[in-house]
Amino acid sequence: MVKLRLKRCGRKQRAIYRIVAIDVRSRREGRDLQKVGFYDPIKNQTYSNVPAILYFLEKGAQPTETVYDILRKTEFFKEFRISFDKKRKEKQES
């Protein structure tokens, strides 16, 4: 199974995260399938490669909660009515 998750880059005390498509069984710093964006929490900048993200989501990739929140802030899911909210609601009820 493939997930969209964050991969840490940068220096000490100056983290930058890449949004990558990666196999679930790989470590955080493991080999990724493709880089699909980045997130800089200090400058609060994001970049996302929309066609690549859509490709992986159509193939069944699941974003982690953090990646989901980052993409939601960039209004990615408003344009492409993708229903991940059902799963999040079920988690909150449990």
UniProtKB/Swiss-Prot annotation:
<protein>
    <recommendedName>
        <fullName>Small ribosomal subunit protein bS16c</fullName>
    </recommendedName>
</protein>
<dbReference type="GO" id="GO:0015935">
    <property type="term" value="C:small ribosomal subunit"/>
</dbReference>
<dbReference type="GO" id="GO:0005739">
    <property type="term" value="C:mitochondrion"/>
</dbReference>
<dbReference type="GO" id="GO:0032543">
    <property type="term" value="P:mitochondrial translation"/>
</dbReference>
<dbReference type="InterPro" id="IPR020592">
    <property type="entry name" value="Ribosomal_bS16_CS"/>
</dbReference>
<dbReference type="Pfam" id="PF00886">
    <property type="entry name" value="Ribosomal_S16"/>
</dbReference>
<keyword id="KW-0687">Ribonucleoprotein</keyword>
<dbReference type="InterPro" id="IPR023803">
    <property type="entry name" value="Ribosomal_bS16_dom_sf"/>
</dbReference>
<dbReference type="GO" id="GO:0009507">
    <property type="term" value="C:chloroplast"/>
</dbReference>
<keyword id="KW-0934">Plastid</keyword>
<comment type="similarity">
    <text>Belongs to the bacterial ribosomal protein bS16 family.</text>
</comment>
<keyword id="KW-0689">Ribosomal protein</keyword>
<dbReference type="GO" id="GO:0003735">
    <property type="term" value="F:structural constituent of ribosome"/>
</dbReference>
<keyword id="KW-0150">Chloroplast</keyword>
<dbReference type="InterPro" id="IPR000307">
    <property type="entry name" value="Ribosomal_bS16"/>
</dbReference>
